[in-house]
Amino acid sequence: MNWTVDIPIDQLPSLPPLPTDLRTRLDAALAKPAAQQPTWPADQALAMRTVLESVPPVTVPSEIVRLQEQLAQVAKGEAFLLQGGDCAETFMDNTEPHIRGNVRALLQMAVVLTYGASMPVVKVARIAGQYAKPRSADIDALGLRSYRGDMINGFAPDAAAREHDPSRLVRAYANASAAMNLVRALTSSGLASLHLVHDWNREFVRTSPAGARYEALATEIDRGLRFMSACGVADRNLQTAEIYASHEALVLDYERAMLRLSDGDDGEPQLFDLSAHTVWIGERTRQIDGAHIAFAQVIANPVGVKLGPNMTPELAVEYVERLDPHNKPGRLTLVSRMGNHKVRDLLPPIVEKVQATGHQVIWQCDPMHGNTHESSTGFKTRHFDRIVDEVQGFFEVHRALGTHPGGIHVEITGENVTECLGGAQDISETDLAGRYETACDPRLNTQQSLELAFLVAEMLRD
């Protein structure tokens, strides 16, 4: 398989050689044990990596540097981080309506949070690369190889479709590039207009069963916008927005193929993972001596690490020391995913231990993954109340310790799916079958996402 030109793989342009020290560090990282990797032929994977090494990147270093600057504000308590999007992107749903819907949902949430926090909101989407998922078992209930995301195999319950296919690496890149191109176009051509986004939010308040609760906040935002209009404020920032791309750095054949060399802030050559602006290491692949953490050490992108209920304060400190050796504010985001019943007990000693190191990390709450259960009707689901409660517990911990609750990381969609229970729509277990469309884990629908944003805005104002 080739990219878009009829050139044999062995004639594609090669990347310039890395400086010796970077080459040594990268090789050492990739030689470590790597969990959750596809089992495909090494020679075919090498051929696909060669293709990806010759293509234009999905992002560019200057955008990553700009994101790093904004994340430094979050780490210092001067901004808030909103990260959200599909649990797993699919090639089939990589369409203009779906991407537009997700971008719109993220923008709607961001407007509410910006007003509630009275500070900038850094917007990061789970988009343009979230095509792979770790799984708890290699074989599913049908006796087939588990679906691991479109980057690795197909979703259809068919043995041939479930084979691990390295040519999907190139398909993932093509879809990611197209998605990122559309995101840039949408956010610079009117969709991100503050007045338009607020009008959508007013519609939510008008039609939602819980709208009355949020009417006061929406009216305040409305008054603020009218005041700016009366003053003749017509700044470009009111018409556009920056949305950065993120995904879990899971499939190392993909991540390593998208590495590019560029000069850093200090003029020294650095390796940027240009498959995204920022990546995170998941709960199942964050082995302290594994390849994923070592890979994250090598790249210049800001990175995140998921912290589940088994995390210890001592291990959290070790992640901080390895991934943020130069104490760069916002370089590292620690994403707690404890579950609503555990966050109030487990998070405080971790925060205290990390804060004592003097590192300025971002504390972010993932209220989704610790609150997943199977419904009586057989669907994997999450209850809206538990999601809200984990965010509330996260805020309570940080308020008590005097630290900054820096952000939330949520799985959302701009479509009216029925995957998570509860919320103002009061989705029940019998409703789940109506529009249960996720390729992996359940997502908050548009109304639930915006309802969560209004509730978090209230927390930010308290």
Swiss-Prot record:
Signal peptide: none annotated. SUPFAM superfamilies: Aldolase (SSF51569). Binds 1 divalent cation per subunit. The enzyme is active with manganese, cobalt or cadmium ions. One of its GO terms (molecular function) is 3-deoxy-7-phosphoheptulonate synthase activity. It catalyses: D-erythrose 4-phosphate + phosphoenolpyruvate + H2O = 7-phospho-2-dehydro-3-deoxy-D-arabino-heptonate + phosphate. GO terms for cellular component: cytosol; peptidoglycan-based cell wall; plasma membrane. InterPro entries: Aldolase_TIM (IPR013785), DAHP_synth_2 (IPR002480). Phosphoenolpyruvate binds at residues 126, 283-284, 306, 337. Keywords: Amino-acid biosynthesis, Aromatic amino acid biosynthesis, Cadmium, Cobalt, Manganese, Metal-binding, Transferase. One of its GO terms (biological process) is protein homooligomerization. It is an enzyme of class 2 (transferase). Mn(2+) binds at residues 87, 369, 411, 441. Pathway: Metabolic intermediate biosynthesis; chorismate biosynthesis; chorismate from D-erythrose 4-phosphate and phosphoenolpyruvate: step 1/7. Feedback inhibited by tryptophan, tyrosine, phenylalanine and chorismate. Its EC number is 2.5.1.54. The keyword Signal does not apply. Belongs to the class-II DAHP synthase family. Homodimer. Interacts with Rv0948c. Catalyzes an aldol-like condensation reaction between phosphoenolpyruvate (PEP) and D-erythrose 4-phosphate (E4P) to generate 3-deoxy-D-arabino-heptulosonate 7-phosphate (DAH7P) and inorganic phosphate. This is Phospho-2-dehydro-3-deoxyheptonate aldolase AroG. It comes from Mycobacterium tuberculosis (strain ATCC 25618 / H37Rv).
